[in-house]
């Protein structure tokens, strides 16, 4: 049976309390694609690597999408009202600010396709990969948060092998 349309302003009014750190997302529709509402502020340092594209729409306020584009670290600003399609396999870190709301649409992953969370060394002279966690993503609502908390709780995973700098899961 088809799901009824969702009135987004009404949903936000009634459910904004569901947008909790560290990811601040809530999956409102599933079925081939997952539609998430994402609030700010968030506090993450990981870069998500998704083998499928991700569609962003900034409903309220602006956000910064930190990406690694052909080996270069750069920021993409997505302003209120903007849409942006991030190609597959681009490491990205969505930075959301206080009192902002976005919608993200991701394709459900086929069996065997792995997502990854990657942390880079925070030392700008180094920027080597500190740790990467690959996993079969089945539940966007819980697995990203679990991977972040796992990284946060293990200093060995957070220590850069190249320069010794200790990374954190929050900026």
From Swiss-Prot:
Its cofactor is Fe(2+). Its EC number is 1.13.11.6. Fe cation binds at residues 48, 54, 92. One of its GO terms (molecular function) is 3-hydroxyanthranilate 3,4-dioxygenase activity. O2 binds at residue 44. The keyword Membrane does not apply. Keywords: Cytoplasm, Dioxygenase, Iron, Metal-binding, Oxidoreductase, Pyridine nucleotide biosynthesis. Belongs to the 3-HAO family. This is 3-hydroxyanthranilate 3,4-dioxygenase. It comes from Yarrowia lipolytica (strain CLIB 122 / E 150) (Yeast).
